[in-house]
Every structure is written in C-alpha cells, then in structure tokens.
Amino acid sequence: MKPETFYNLLAEQNLPLSDQQKEQFERYFELLVEWNEKINLTAITDKEEVYLKHFYDSIAPILQGLIPNETIKLLDIGAGAGFPSLPMKILYPELDVTIIDSLNKRINFLQLLAQELDLNGVHFYHGRAEDFAQDKNFRAQYDFVTARAVARMQVLSELTIPYLKVGGKLLALKASNAPEELLEAKNALNLLFSKVEDNLSYALPNRDPRYITVVEKKKETPNKYPRKAGMPNKRPL
C-alpha cells in the first residue's frame, strides 16, 4: 500500500490526515527501518508493506468504530515497535497512551520515536505486564487495553483484564480466527469477571483476514490475578 493509498483510504472514511500527520507516519517508517538494523523490531521493512501491515492494520479499532477521539486512557501490552497504539495516537491525538514492554531496547526506541514525532500524552514503561498489573497506579486505571498478536486469549486475558476499569474493554487484534481460542479461554474469562462482547472479522485492503475480539470487564478483578510473571503462560487459567 503506497502512502497516498493509505491517505486516500482514510479520507474516504472521514479521517483525512493533515500534512503533519502524514509527516509523522513517514518519519515513523524511517525510524522503524533505521532502528530495525540495531534491534529486532519487525520482519516487515518494505515501505508499502509497513503502511499496510503495520500502520493500516494498527488503526483497525478506529476504523471499526471501537475507539473515540477523546482523552481516554489506552494501555498497549507488548507493543513492540508501537503497534497498534502509536498509529492510533497519530490519528487520534487526544488519546492518552501507555505502553508496557519487557525489552528495554524497545522502550528506548519508543521514547525516541515519540520525541521525533512530537507525540504528547504517551508513557512508556519497561517491565512485565504481570508485575505492573499489581501496582495501584496501573491496576483498574484504563478504558481500553490493546494487544496485537501477543498471546492466546486464555493467557492474554489474565495479562490485560486487571488493568481495565469496570466497563473497560480489551481489544485483541489477531490475524487468525478465534472461535476455538475463545472456547479455551472461557474459564479464564469467567474467573476474571469478563465477557466477550464481539468478535469482529474484516479484511485488509489486500484481502488478508483480520479479527478483533472485544472483551468487556464486568466486575473488579480478584486480587490474586494476574499471578507471578511467567505463570499465566506456563499454567493458563
């Protein structure tokens, strides 16, 4: 997808980009490729592929009408090179975005990126999702948690639901269909007092299938969740 195609598709969906936003995406691409040579950020470095499979793919929650352009608190778990939250932040500057990532080198990249793109209202923390979720400054503080290709729902739910306010939503972006995954996650979702609200399916402009599973938090998460770092993966609920 050429940058012009990206701009046009957004304009068609009533999301026209300003020159500044176009420049932000362009600089994002340049820094991604430059830093990818120092630290492994992505296997996708071709410009048209980045615009399609990283930028366009990341803004799906906005295109699907799931996220408003308001000062809401969004947490992105395991964002890697900033996907999906930072492309959404460029598009919707009002969003207040926090990223937690377990690799310090990636956090360094994200801090530089935010500086270069002049993004305000972005916060980066180095560490494990399981640890931060037990910190009262993070637990039950967010309207949305996003995770793109991070883990199966059975594991992902324990890593993310504790961060949500009651009524808040987890948006899990996936490239493969999730019905059997949701069956496996049924017990975990019940224990975490959360419920699958929707499982949206759509296609990228190149026809690649994509899914967003929307999970709503119904009640406060029991204090024992999430368990210690590594446990959700080792012994899923």
UniProtKB/Swiss-Prot annotation:
Subcellular location(s) of the protein: Cytoplasm
Keywords for the protein's UniProt record, in alphabetical order: Cytoplasm, Methyltransferase, rRNA processing, S-adenosyl-L-methionine, Transferase
Molecular functions per Gene Ontology: rRNA (guanine-N7-)-methyltransferase activity
Superkingdom of origin: Bacteria
Keyword Signal on entry: no
Region (Disordered): 218-237
Function per UniProt: Specifically methylates the N7 position of a guanine in 16S rRNA.
Family: Belongs to the methyltransferase superfamily. RNA methyltransferase RsmG family.
Name this polypeptide is given: Ribosomal RNA small subunit methyltransferase G
Keyword Transcription regulation: no
Gene3D superfamilies given in the database record: Vaccinia Virus protein VP39
CDD domains per UniProt: AdoMet_MTases
Gene Ontology cellular component terms for the protein in this record: cytosol
Residue intervals passing through the bilayer: none
EC number of this enzyme: 2.1.1.-
Entry binding sites for S-adenosyl-L-methionine: 78, 83, 129-130, 148
Lineage: Bacteria, Bacillati, Bacillota, Bacilli, Lactobacillales
